[in-house]
Amino acid sequence: MDATHVLCGFSKGLLADLDDLLPPASVLVVEDEYVAAQRDVHRRSAQHPCVAGVVHAPVQDERNPAGIVRAVSRPEHVRAVVPSTEYGVVAAAALAGAWGLPGAGPAAAAVLRDKAALRAHADSAGLPQPRWRLAGSAAEVEDFRAALGGRCVLKPVDRQASLGVLLLDAEDDTDTAWKATTTAEEPRMRAPGTSSGRFLVEERLTGPEVSVECLVHRGDLLFTNVTGKQLRPGPYPVEIGHVVPAGLPAPVTGELTRLMRRLVESTGFSSGVLHAEWILVDGTRPHLVECAGRLPGDSIDTLIDLAHGGRIVADLLAVLQEGPPPVRGPARAGAAIRFLTARPGMVRAVSGLTASRESNGVREVELTARQGTVVGELNSSWDRLGHVLATGATGAEAARNAAAAAALVEVRTS
């Protein structure tokens, strides 16, 4: 098959975008064989006209990126390699580098995919961030947190979607937290044997959280967006809402942009999209949480499109295939998403969907739970049940619209 675009990892949402942007049979999906079977990738990919085929390769073997280069033959007319999942970032950079195409760059991709490597890099680059260390046991976590008054953050170095991330207060048991973090798994998303099995313990900072999305072309920031975040209170910091634009004071936005530019320059990140999360200590001083070298999840790309106009996916393709650099302006409206959750138990009834869809500014309402669905604890992004996406004249108005519409949806469990 002679595809023009290669995707490292299966992403239903990205393929839906590419159906609108690319000709039929132009995309090759590269996925790990185990993950492809678990996620029914062949059948699901066949539902997208843009897909030419699916090939199996060690796309998640980040310790041996040369393996993906040996396993995947270069399509004759390939124009771009796209990291379509978090676990495909290193593979995409490796293929793009080997094939002479624009991309993150192998060295930058390796740093972004390892939270410990990113922490070490941020220290050397002078980027503000929490104090941290690698932890190999509950005892090491206990020693670290004791020096900080007992509060800390515990997380895996190479997972996504807040999986295994725990916020500890002084009274929380270290052994229980260590077990929860070290046993957190994504059996359908992560290939066996590919996780490094390493963990971080970090200083727990306080302040609002935001993410910064940057479109980067040959090391230059073409576009920067700041997304406001709402996190669920409690030990599991699951994101339950986003809003674009965040509506921060201009000096804070300027400082975030300056720090993103330093991150790009210091890592050598070349071309693509960055999605970095920051805590604003005292509401004004950004401290780095983490950074991904791919499109943002949680429909943030859709929020950016609705607020700013244009298509961020089309812009990504432009910088990855050396097209004319896209031009974007400031946000012209607001867009927000609110995620739907429920108490653990079996779903007995669902109501309010019609009213929610008819609410002010609502663009989309999705709910996966049905009568009889078993709802578990809300420990990661994978445990959310759906979302409401809304727009408004400003980010604040969009956030109010999304929250009001989400409040109309009731999922009763027992």
For the regions a language model picked out, list residue spans one by one:
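Domain-scale detector for complete catalytic domains at protein termini or as standalone homologs
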Residues: 3-75
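Short beta->alpha connector loops
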Residues: 8-14, 87, 135-139, 205-206
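Conserved N-proximal alpha/beta basic substrate-recognition cap immediately N-terminal to
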Residues: 41, 49-136, 384
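Conserved ATP-binding module of the ATP-grasp superfamily
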Residues: 128-130, 151-154, 169-206, 239-242, ...
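Short beta-strand-to-turn element immediately C-terminal to the catalytic PLP-Schiff-base lysine
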Residues: 135, 165-170, 215-217, 281
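Acidic/histidine-enriched active-site and ligand-binding environments that engage anionic O-linkages
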Residues: 145-154, 223
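ATP-dependent carboxylate/phosphate-activation module, predominantly the ATP-grasp catalytic core
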Residues: 196, 203-269, 273, 280, ...
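Peripheral (often C-terminal) accessory segments that flank ATP-dependent C-N-forming ligase machineries
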Residues: 317-414
